Amino acid sequence: MKVIFMGTPEFAVPALKKLITHHEVKAVFTQQPKAKGRGLNLAKSPIHQLAFEHQIPVYTPSTLRNDVINLINKVNADIIVVIAYGFIVPQAILEAKKYGCLNIHPSDLPRHRGAAPLQRTIIEGDRKSSVCIMRMDTGLDTGDILMKEDFDLEERTTLEELHNKCANLGAELLIKILANIDNIVPIKQSSDGVTYAHKLTKEEGKINWHESAYKIDCKIRGMNPWPGAYFSYNDKIIKILEAEYLNADHHFTSGTVISDKLEIACGSGILRVKKLQQESKKALNIEEFLRGTNILKDTVLK
């Protein structure tokens, strides 16, 4: 099948690799190169790099206006696959090809529609999730489902683990669909259980020690690497990169450091910190961190 691919980050890479192997990718659309690092050198997106390596024509428009729509109409393709592209796709593009536009969404739709389904799945402590392949419409992740696979999450699944699982599973489902697309009956999404996975903000990363240790641990795993779950100490922002929660009763004020190994009393339970990063410094395990930053027992963190 002849395919136009629209995507940008690492999450979209497994699907493009599968499409290159099993189908004919006629064109790739991705975000423009962005300045990165201290030298602010322009860096191509992971999808741009992969397409370039396979000599596939790459386009990096700043908008999806008429000139881009006309270009897409001229590309000889049967279907468009859109994965974390970074632009809202207009109706003219959704309807440009015979089989429309397909999208991989890493959640149990209609739960976690929106920009940050992976992060919200972890933050909210979900123990089950899904990967859905849908035919896109003009709504926000409201399209009909062509294929879905459910799976269980381990209690302390990390964002990286969930990201990789969904990216690879989505790529496999996509190839199955394209092999049998004329025989698949789309299923409308339920109107029940709709939630929205809004984009994360830096402010959301601030830890509220009145919450349970379990909920804070979910936040730490769901917000690593960005924006990071953090607290302030001596006017410095400190991110917690890894921790574990203990279901232990205590009588301390929430936020109290109750041991010299940085165990912190929460609204319920205790958070045992394992890895941290102070702003503008490298990540350290707890032993290394405490050698340079002495957070005393009985300190109450804010």
Curated annotation (Swiss-Prot):
<dbReference type="Pfam" id="PF02911">
    <property type="entry name" value="Formyl_trans_C"/>
</dbReference>
<dbReference type="GO" id="GO:0004479">
    <property type="term" value="F:methionyl-tRNA formyltransferase activity"/>
</dbReference>
<dbReference type="InterPro" id="IPR011034">
    <property type="entry name" value="Formyl_transferase-like_C_sf"/>
</dbReference>
<dbReference type="GO" id="GO:0005829">
    <property type="term" value="C:cytosol"/>
</dbReference>
<dbReference type="InterPro" id="IPR036477">
    <property type="entry name" value="Formyl_transf_N_sf"/>
</dbReference>
<keyword id="KW-0808">Transferase</keyword>
<dbReference type="InterPro" id="IPR005793">
    <property type="entry name" value="Formyl_trans_C"/>
</dbReference>
<keyword id="KW-0648">Protein biosynthesis</keyword>
<dbReference type="InterPro" id="IPR002376">
    <property type="entry name" value="Formyl_transf_N"/>
</dbReference>
<feature type="binding site">
    <location>
        <begin position="107"/>
        <end position="110"/>
    </location>
    <ligand>
        <name>(6S)-5,6,7,8-tetrahydrofolate</name>
    </ligand>
</feature>
<dbReference type="InterPro" id="IPR041711">
    <property type="entry name" value="Met-tRNA-FMT_N"/>
</dbReference>
<comment type="similarity">
    <text>Belongs to the Fmt family.</text>
</comment>
<protein>
    <recommendedName>
        <fullName>Methionyl-tRNA formyltransferase</fullName>
        <ecNumber>2.1.2.9</ecNumber>
    </recommendedName>
</protein>
<comment type="function">
    <text>Attaches a formyl group to the free amino group of methionyl-tRNA(fMet). The formyl group appears to play a dual role in the initiator identity of N-formylmethionyl-tRNA by promoting its recognition by IF2 and preventing the misappropriation of this tRNA by the elongation apparatus.</text>
</comment>
<dbReference type="Pfam" id="PF00551">
    <property type="entry name" value="Formyl_trans_N"/>
</dbReference>
<dbReference type="InterPro" id="IPR044135">
    <property type="entry name" value="Met-tRNA-FMT_C"/>
</dbReference>
<dbReference type="InterPro" id="IPR005794">
    <property type="entry name" value="Fmt"/>
</dbReference>
